[in-house]
Amino acid sequence: MEAARVRAANASEVVCAAWASELVRGAAWLEDVGAKWVRPHRFWPEQERALGSCAAWYPGIYRQMAPCCAGVRLEFETDASELVLEIALDAEPAATSRVLAGVAEKGLLAPGAHDALAVDVDGKRLADVPLDAVEPPAEHGPRGSEVAFELAAGAASGDLLQLPGFADASRVCVWLPALRGARLGRVRGNGTFLRPVERDATVRRLLVLGDSVAQGFVCDSPAASWPAIVARERGLDLVNQSVGGQVFQPSALVGLDRLDAPDVVIVALGANYSYGRASVAVVSREVTEYLSRVDALWPDASLLVMVPPAGGKTSVPGSCYPFIGKIIGDAVARVRVRRVSEGRVAVYEVVQPELGEELLSDADGHPTAEGARILADFVDARLDELLECTCLRDFGQFGRCGACLGTAATPEDAIAGERGDDPADSIEDEE
């Protein structure tokens, strides 16, 4: 049988089951929509109001993007060989449709939703179900569809039928769509148990504050975005508060003090300043205030700030984008001075790699799955430096300790998939 398939919701026999409300990870809160179904929200209500307010650059877009389930997932353990997820998808947001129209115009990728439900088993990708296949016909009713996943392939057992309850226990992660919202019912299986994964206090928490690239445009699967890849491969507990079209909006952080404190915060904003006119002075104040608020919220979290690449992107007349690298750098420097003076972990600023045209799905710089993989590898290497480097804490500057010198790689190295010369050769001696 196929690893994943779709069928209409029905009253088929339940062997083991759990409500999605018990299994959701990566959401700020859950909205009860009746009959024990829930809608996961990535943002607290105060944040949602701020995203749709006059303080936002593109409130109409943000109101559409906030309900999307980027980074939200169901995590559980089961001995079932087949699972069924009850899900009702939201309609595709108009803002998403406009981006996908640009993808179709470029022609590198085939037309479609470019989003999916994705399943990991024991930390490895199992299957994706494109949303084009999940969206139910009207006659299926308000409860939407059932998506069935097989966890035990017949070929692995000599094409013999796997009896219910005889499969090995597995840890399963179901990634919800990145580019639209959803309502969730039960997860059912044919095994003897299906239970939530116990929270492990030793697992580091990762919070990503980014734009459409970090949200998951347009890499075809929610499990293929760079935040999802980094979280899966490093075993991090991810909350992804990335929003298509977002910039440094300080008011969007209001209410985040209720979130469980992250161990690592990645800020990946700035590229969208290329689309609008803005004063350098105003944007400088907003970027400084934003990063200062992040620092105040989580003073002990490792902070990675990703600056958009300097080249390869045109901007409208009057845009501050040509200066955004310096604007972000100056704001990071203020946070760094404060952290170093207090003996806390320092902030790390890096420039994102510039992807080639063959790695971009459209003219707006959204990566393909291959491009997202390169970004994930780049971020992963930077986290090695950030989490292992002591010179950032002691000196506020990268390049002093063996940990960072041993793992440093340039953006060009990341794109080429190989290391260049010894990075120590390019670091100036400041003794």
Q: What does each of the following model-derived ranges do?
A:
Residues 1-205, 382-431:
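N-terminal secretory targeting modules
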Residues 17-19, 29, 45, 221-229, ...:
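Secondary-structure junction/capping motif
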Residues 61-63, 242-246:
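Short, flexible loop segments at the rims of nucleotide/cofactor-binding pockets, characterized by
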Residues 67, 71, 77, 252-405, ...:
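Alpha-helical cap/lid subdomain in secreted, periplasmic
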Residues 85, 239-242, 305:
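A structural signal for short, well-ordered beta-strand segments and their strand-loop junctions
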Residues 156-166, 182, 217-230, 255-269, ...:
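Short, charge-rich amphipathic segments
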Residues 174-244, 253-261, 391:
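Serine-esterase "nucleophile elbow" of acetyl-processing enzymes
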Residues 248-250:
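Active-site-proximal loop/helix segments of hydrolase catalytic cores
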